[in-house]
Structures are given as C-alpha cells and as structure tokens.
Regions:
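Soluble FAD-dependent oxygen oxidases
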Residues: 2-537
Length: 537
C-alpha cells in the first residue's frame, strides 16, 4: 500500500526500503528464532553444534521377531519408503544438509492413528528404533537415524477453521489456512517447520510478546502413546501430560497427531528494519537490550550481528514488528535511535497485513504458497517448491539481565572473529541473534507449563553456516567458542527447540525446575523408552 508523505525523522525513513527487510529474512529457517527466523523440528527435537548426531539411546524393548518391512508396508494406508525405492533419497532427507549421511531403515508417511499404532507395534516387536518427524528441522538430526523407522506425520496436515491443526502441517500452510477464515495463532516464521515441533518445544515468534508462545495458545492435543493408546489431553483430561506437552513434548511421550489452538482475529501489522555501520555496533546492542524488552507488548524486536568470512566488515541491524499503529512504532524506533546516538543508515517502516508480514519473514514474499515449500513429491513438499535446504549449526542462551559492557564487547569480538575465517574455509556466515522477551511470555507462571523460561529478558541464538558438502570445521569451532565466551554472561538456560547435543547438563538448561516431574511422567507414559534419543527425558 502507498504510505502518506513522512516528515524528516531521526531514523531517516526511506521509501522503497522494504526489499531490505525481505533480503535480511530470506534465510528464515536458520536465523534468530523459531519465531523470527529459526528452525524447530515438528515432532522430534532440534538444536545442536556437533557435525553429526550422537548415537541414539537404545530402547529397553527386546525384539520378539524379525523386522519384516514388507509386511509392515502392507499393513499401512500410508506409504513406506525403503532404501531401494526411487523416493528414498528425498524421503530420508532432513532440512539441514549436514545430516545427509543418515540412512533410516524406512520412512513411514503415516496417514492416521492406525498407521502409527502399526508402526509402534512393529518397533516394539522387532526392536527397531523409532524417530518422529514432521518438518525435519531437528538441529541435532534426531528426527532420523541410521537403521531407524522414521514416522513422518506430514500427511496429517489438515488446518481446520476452528483452530484444530494436523501435527504435520507446515507453518506456511497453517498461516494461509487460518487466514482464509480471518484467524491466526502466534508462531514461528520458517515456512517449512511443522506446527507440532514448534508448539511442543515452546514456540517463539514475532507475536509472542503480545499473544504468548505458541504452546500458550494450545488448548488440546491428541497423541498415540508408546503402548498404542490414543489420548486426547487438555486441562481436564490427562492434565499432567497436557502440562508436559507444552514445552517438553518433542519426541518424549508419544506421536502427536493433532493440536487445537485458541485462535485470534488476523491483525494489521507494522514492520521495521534498521541498520547501522559496524562502528556503531556497541551503541546499538547496548541501547537495544534496554529498549527491546521494555516496549509495550505489541512491539517485538530483535538485534542481529552478522559476519562473513574473509575480513569484511560485520553488520548490525534491528528488526521490529508491531500489532499497534504505524505512529507508535515510528515513535518507538525514534527513541531507539536517540539512545544509540545516531540515525540508522538504512530504514524500512511499513504497514502490512499479518499474512503479508509472515510471508516476508518467511522469505516467501512474491511467490506462491506452493512455491513456499521444499521441492518434491513426498508429503510435505510440492512439485512447485522453490525453497532450498541449508547447512548450519546453532546454540542458544537466555539472558536474565542486560549484558554488562564486557558482555556486549564479547558479542562484538565473537562476531568479528568470524570475519577472520578465510573465504577458502567452507564459506558460510556467522550470526548472533538477540530476541526481546517479556510481555505475555513472562506473564505465564513458570509452573503452568513445562516451558519454564518465563523470567528472561533476551533469547540469544548463535548460528554458524557453511558450504554444503564441506566439513565446516572453522565455522563450528567459531560456534563452540562463541557459546563458551557468552556462558558467564548468560543464565545457564537454553531453548529446548534449539537442541544442543554439546550440553552436558541439558535437563537443567532446558527444563529447570520441571525436570524431575517430567522424568516421572516419562516413566509413566513410556516405561520401556520406545521414544529414545540422546536427550530424551
């Protein structure tokens, strides 16, 4: 839409700058968070810094018969893809190319709960390890595994007008499906992430400060447990399991098939993007960390530090999203510029529909819904898909307090360190994304759900990417050293949707005070540990 003429402002608003925002978010699946740019698997787990996943924790279930996959295939309504099948090279892929070496025994594209029961019975009977997958965005590769039976729920993708959504629905389809009825839910921005993994691990997004996490809008869930029972859980039925699924549900208690959400009318939005020269980076980070978490609930923001290899200057930018008025966000970013002490060198401020904003953050502005998918013919993909997979690793921290000057300097030093990686060393990029928390997120009691991170000011994600097919050793070393450098400035907690295999005390980092209760529930609902992976409860 055309904007009215604007007076000169301290943020130096420019026309036609929307392309800047689109370009910055074009890699929406390996950016700041599962809300603005971060991936989360859809029914498994996600996160990590190691180049390859740890070996899976074996199930306690003893095999009682041979693994006859041909018989399993005949018992399913959905398709079972084996290594000899033409679709296997695509079926075995996760979103992150660093796990392309994983070779599951079979991928079952389940069509309903009966298919899931057949697969779980087969796994119990034969001792075949199980992985659960929807979006396939697991940072640790734990939605697949060598010799595993992968239960892919992508076919369970119905988006109902009343807010009931199949566990395998991709976020692009969730937003577009709900928008047809004038509705939405708070969620992430990576279009190919599955709704269930986002929700079951919490679910940060650009509307989270206004509406809460994705899991905070969940009102019911249906799942098939390890013994083949179908349970529908909510505040009245199996309330303990309903509590656990909101923050610790990824791959721990069963195969989720359906989620029901409290929906909201689709709002109008305003987006902003501002960048400064790297010489202003200290002032930008120092000012933003006080400004971002203190804004009204309707204003979300993130600060982003990024560098490429080869000695070039890093970049520093701030993105903001508001459910309020254009003028309110304009005034807010002017106050940020005042705190920084310098106008931004480039700015975009624009009114958008909520649906348009989600497409922009997804990197799908200007393309069709069908194109906003991975290409292919297997469930969850489209033949018109134009999105590409990525190669990266990540780690996270929660900051409960503003960073000290030493903490801010550590962020800048680590960003500059990536620029010293030679261009010839697998390329890629390094980034540090800081997302403002507070608002509706922090008004939920830490005891109300299994997502206990309700008192932090900032979620930090450190991301390293490299050229597909290369080792990325220098990039992963940078990531490890960056996470270590920020440890003393952080709370010790980590975001469970950014699963990190390198964490030793992951139970405390992900689940804090909820860890013991969750462990007891795991024993009750999965006593034989059919659902097992290195960081299973």
């Amino acid at each position: 839409m055309n904007l009215p003429p604007l007076p000169a402002r301290r943020t130096l608003l420019t026309t036609g700058a929307a392309a800047i925002l689109t370009g910055v978010t074009a890699t929406a699946c390996s950016g700041t968070s599962d809300g603005s740019t971060g991936p989360s698997d859809a029914s498994g787990t996600s996160g990590g810094t190691d180049a390859s996943p740890a070996p899976p924790t074996p199930s306690k279930t003893a095999p009682t018969g041979p693994a006859d996959f041909s018989a399993l295939a005949k018992s399913l309504d959905g398709s079972l893809v084996r290594p000899q099948d033409a679709s296997y090279p695509t079926a075995r892929q996760l979103y992150n190319t660093r796990f392309d070496g994983l070779k599951p025994a079979a991928v079952a594209y389940v069509r309903h709960e009966a298919d899931i029961r057949e697969c779980l019975a087969f796994a119990r009977r034969t001792g075949t390890p199980v992985s659960i997958r929807s979006g396939g965005h697991s940072y640790a590769g734990w939605s697949s595994g060598n010799g595993h039976l992968v239960l892919d729920v992508s076919s369970l993708s119905r988006v109902g007008s009343g807010g009931t959504i199949g566990a395998g629905a991709k976020l692009i389809d969730v937003y577009q499906g709900l928008a047809r009825n004038g509705l939405t839910i708070p969620g992430g921005s990576c279009p190919t992430v599955g709704i269930s993994g986002l929700t079951l691990g919490g679910g940060h997004g650009v509307a989270s400060r206004a509406y809460g996490l994705t899991c905070d809008s969940l009102t019911a869930a249906t799942l098939v447990t390890a013994d083949g029972k179908t349970l529908t859980v909510d505040a009245e039925n199996h309330p303990d399991l309903f509590w656990a699924l909101r923050g610790a549900g990824n791959g721990n208690f069963g195969v989720v098939t359906e989620l029901t959400f409290r929906t909201r009318p689709v709002p109008q939005t305003v987006t902003a993007y501002m960048s400064w020269p790297w010489s202003r980076a200290r002032s930008v980070v120092s000012a933003w960390q006080e400004w971002g978490p203190a804004q009204p609930d309707e204003i979300w923001s993130s600060a982003h530090l990024a560098a490429g290899p080869g000695g070039g200057n890093p970049t520093v930018s701030v993105a903001a999203f508001s459910l309020g008025t254009y003028g309110d966000l304009q005034n807010a970013v002017d106050l940020l510029a005042d705190r920084i002490g310098a106008p931004a060198s480039s700015v975009s401020l624009r009114r958008r529909s909520y649906q348009e904003s989600m497409l922009v953050y997804a990197g799908c502005s200007g393309i069709t819904d069908a194109q906003c998918h991975l290409p292919g013919t297997t469930p969850g993909r489209t033949t018109q898909g134009t999105l590409q997979r990525e190669t990266y690793a990540a780690a996270s921290d929660f900051y409960d307090r503003s960073l000290s000057p030493a903490g801010v300097q550590a962020l800048l030093d680590r960003t500059e360190a990536f620029a010293r990686i030679p261009v010839t060393a697998s390329g890629g990029g390094g980034s540090i994304a800081l997302t403002a928390l507070g608002g509706a997120i922090n008004r939920v009691s830490p005891q109300s759900t299994a997502f206990v991170h309700r008192g932090s000011r900032v979620l930090a994600q450190y991301i390293a990417s490299w050229t597909p097919g290369t080792a990325g050793a220098a990039q992963q070393d940078w990531l490890k050293n960056t996470h270590a450098a920020m440890r003393r400035h952080a709370s010790g907690a980590a975001y469970q949707n950014y699963t990190n295999p390198a964490l030793t005390d992951w139970r405390r980092a992900y689940y804090g005070s909820a860890a013991d209760r969750l462990a007891d529930l795991k024993k009750r609902y999965d006593p034989e540990r059919l659902f097992a992976f290195p960081q299973a409860l």
